[in-house]
UniProtKB/Swiss-Prot annotation:
GO cellular component: cytoplasm
Any one GO molecular-function label of the UniProt entry: RNA binding
The protein's name: Probable RNA-binding protein 46
InterPro entries (alphabetical): HnRNP_R/Q_splicing_fac, Nucleotide-bd_a/b_plait_sf, RBD_domain_sf, RBM46_DSR, RBM46_RRM2, RRM_dom
Amino acid sequence: MEDNCTDMFNGCSKFDISIQTQVALLALIDNTGYTMVQVNGQRKFGGPPPGWEGPPPPRGCEVFVGKIPRDMYEDKLVPLFARAGKIYEFRLMMEFSGENRGYAFVMYTNKEEALLAIRMLNNYEICQGKFIGVCVSLDNCRLFIGSIPQEKRKEEILEEMKKVTEGVMDVIVYPSATDKTKNRGFAFVMYESHRAAAMARRKLIPGPFQLWGHTIKVAWASPEKEVDEETMQKVKVLYVRNLMMSTTEETIKAEFNRYKPGVVERVKKIRDYAFVHFFRRDYAIAAMSVMNGRLIDGARIEVTLAKPVNKEAAWRQNGNGHMNANSECLLNFANKEGSQKALDMCSNVPAYLNNPNSPTFLEPETCTYPCIPGTKLTPINLYSLKIHHFHSAVMHLEYFCYKNNWSFPEYYLYSTTGQDGKMLLAYKVILPAITGNTNSYFMPDKLCSFVEDAKELAAQFTLMHLDYSYHPTSGKNISLPSTAATSGTSGVLPYTPKPYSYSSYPSSPNVSLTNGGSVGKQLYVSNQASYFSG
């Protein structure tokens, strides 16, 4: 007991911890028999609990708690969360001042209790006018490895990663969208545990690390979204990967209808992957077993059940530890040892551009505050900001290029005349770092009435092809796992932009927009030097 007290209040003279709080925490330890220690900016209660034998609980037993009042501690929080089940470990993030940082992680002894805690305590009014947010927290066991030679096969990459790191379970390698004999220049390495992944990252990151004579890039990969079994039992949409770029939706529908005609409701194809919607779940399950590994237009496809979106309200971790609505799809938390936690929090997210079935975009948050006379303002570098400080797709794309040490995107403006005689606009985006001297570019297939909207749409379209993939369960439900997905983007750092909002503009007619022809170049805009040309 005395040792526990020493660890728990180690350096307590530096903290403004009230005597009443100390007494309450000591009483909690005495009543429960749990240990409590403070280390690396977090206070750990339990882990393991008294009398525990065997390994820690499996992945999926931990929940994240946000919007905790700063002056609330374990003496109030632990009894509350114990209502859902036996707590294996409670970790409260702490400030140096002694206040908590507004969030915590609670690990239960099984997944059922963790899910019950979410149902019971998400949006729970913990004190008058204060509501906490609770959602699933997942240990990240995957690393992103970039700048891999594109001719290397999965077996070679797996063998090499096992040589240089321990605990490797598998590697995920995607073929190029344009050449199926090559990989995309990156892979995801699966480890047996979060600790194994963290140790591997620590070994690979400090300095330039080479494989096959190439300096590789290493980063945490966004963990795969986990969906509860009850929800997955309702899914009747298949996710089909590794298609040829030239394969059409009609071909895919015909192939999946072959085993039983008329079972496919619709198909949505995006670059080299597609979503196949079935009229019934049993049709989808049967088709998955029959079609997985089959050849379509010479490409061997991978078929899995699409993962639906979590429809509950999402929360976002701010710098002060509080959570707000309208969040990114996934939130990542790194502790001082470089380990990472990812929270599975999907909510309203952007659909495929201008899909008639897409949901309404979220309105941007109100972020204006009064500037009181005498307020001290400090000059800062634009790229020292965090991702949540950017809202527009144009800024996200520029930030994305900066993070990958690429030159900034180049925007080329095109125009055409609509059926009503109105001028319509579209931008073509060129990324010199990945297109080189080729004619490759990114250009949306929709036109806008206003130049600002056209540029924003082009930037989002480019980001989608660099880093987005979509997993709808219907035309109105879509999620965004972070997966680099473009041929020629080897070594791209994983990056998940937030959803964007646009002002309303009239829907454009289906005008053929090509590079040249009847659509003339009107304007070139560079992020570094703007000039006009005829």
